[in-house]
Amino acid sequence: GKFRISGIKSTNPIAVGDKVIFDLDKKGDEETGVIKKIIDRDNFIVRKSVNLSKQIHIIAANIDQVFLLITINNPPTFAAFIDRFLVSTRAYRIDTILVFNKIDTYKLEERAEILYLKDIYEAIGYRCIEVSSTENKNVDTVKELMIGKTSMFVGHSGVGKSTLVNAIEPSLDLKTKEISEQHKQGQHTTTFAEMFDLSFNARIIDTPGIKGFGIVDI
């Protein structure tokens, strides 16, 4: 059936994280869930639809917190992208933690840039964590912050979302890919947002890499 959410014109009226009321439709040995109602959302994250500029795409709903993964290079995450994303999460009342990922790969000048960015964002109240999945640096810190919550991981393609998720919950075994040498950008491994129940009383929403983030109706 078709669903319309009051006040929202989106390409996907049902999103990852939605809570719904449904009926079971049984045909032979197969049962299919038929959604009857979408329960009012506590919050949601949206971005402009790529092909339909007047419409939006709901990335996920009912989120307790977001981990925004940032890399200084391979690929670079620019401050303009970070700021637009933080404006959106603040507007929708979603706590956001900045994860400076691949910390083991940076040279001295790149480390200085991370410290500069951390000073800026910590001064306005955002928690910043330096993480290395390969060296297991602060992976447990991220994991502890996730307990009892639904967390969304987001960032550009290639920032190491899937690698970090695998370090947190190895049984998920999410696919990862190397950075494209030609374009210095990540290659998509996650093609749609997906929620996973984790073994330590937490849920994670893994999202596709985002090239740009357009603010909508704020």
Model-derived regions: residue spans:
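Conserved G1/Walker A P-loop phosphate-binding module
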Residues: G1, T11-G28, N136-I218
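N-terminal accessory targeting/assembly segments
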Residues: G1-A79
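Histidine-anchored nucleotide/phosphate-binding helix
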Residues: A80-D95
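Canonical P-loop GTPase G-domain recognition
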Residues: T105-V159
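Conserved beta-strand/loop subsegment of P-loop NTPase cores
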Residues: N62-I70, R93-I103, G125-E130
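Conserved nucleotide-binding/hydrolysis micro-motifs of P-loop NTPases
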Residues: K26-D29, D40-N43, I72-P75, K102-Y106, ...
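Conserved, well-folded catalytic cores of nucleic-acid-processing
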Residues: R41, L69, N73, S88, ...
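Conserved ATPase-coupling elements of RecA-like P-loop NTPase cores
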Residues: F78-A79, K107-E113, G214-D217
